[in-house]
Regions:
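Extended assembly-interface/linker segments at domain junctions
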Residues: 1-6, 10
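Long, highly charged, low-complexity intrinsically disordered interaction regions
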Residues: 14-19, 24-34, 38, 68-194, ...
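Long, charge-rich alpha-helical interaction segments
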Residues: 36, 43-72
Length: 200
């Protein structure tokens, strides 16, 4: 491909590896859903720590990596990988958030550039460091922070999960109230004062 030679391995072996990877992906997705559910509860109760955020980013990255691995097997299997491709498509849940929205929720001064740098740093961690929550916290922008440091979410992720709220309105709400706790404490009049809310 493009002048590069790739060794195509035995189809039966690849199918076995692909099926194992699919099973791993299913397990990782279940774990990620549980972690996200726990994070939501902690956010609402205002009990989130940096360790909770790092653990969520870790699980998201592990899911991303196994999806990439399965995609590689599908490519190598060609026509023999159709079933695996279908299974992968089913497991690519569009409702599962990416690490970017977690970073926008928690980084001290989030902007597209440092979010991009954080995502790249997370993706570049080796297998040894991806299991170390302190390393994860450091590379995404929390160097020098303890894992038990309390954090306040801005509310991007939870708002993004409400389909009836357009992204632009979510952004305005976060900009207006600053934190999820402040948003939850807002009165109806406070909410209506935000452009695009309540027919405003």
């Amino acid at each position: 491909v493009d002048g590069t030679r790739y060794t195509v391995q035995d189809t039966q072996y690849l199918m076995s590896r692909a099926n194992q990877a699919i099973q791993t992906l299913e397990s990782y997705k279940k774990r990620l859903r549980k972690v996200l559910g726990t994070l939501s509860t902690l956010e609402i109760e205002s009990h989130v720590t940096l360790g909770d955020v790092a653990a969520t980013l870790q699980r998201m990255e592990m899911v991303r990596r196994i999806i990439s691995e399965v995609s590689h097997y599908v490519l190598e299997l060609g026509v023999h990988g159709r079933l695996v491709a279908l299974q992968l498509e089913e497991l690519r849940s569009p409702d599962m958030p990416g690490s970017e929205i977690i970073l926008f929720d928690y980084l001290p001064n989030p902007n597209p550039r440092n979010i991009g740098d954080a995502v790249e740093a997370l993706e570049n961690l080796d297998d040894m460091n991806i299991v170390d929550l302190k390393v994860i916290a450091q590379v995404v922008g929390f160097e020098g922070y303890d894992l038990d440091t309390p954090l306040q979410p801005r509310g991007y992720r939870l708002l993004d999960g409400i389909q009836s709220i357009p992204h632009i309105i979510s952004s305005r709400l976060v900009e207006r109230f600053g934190t999820l706790q402040a948003l939850m404490a807002a009165t109806l009049e406070d909410l209506r004062a935000v452009e695009g809310v309540g027919g405003n």
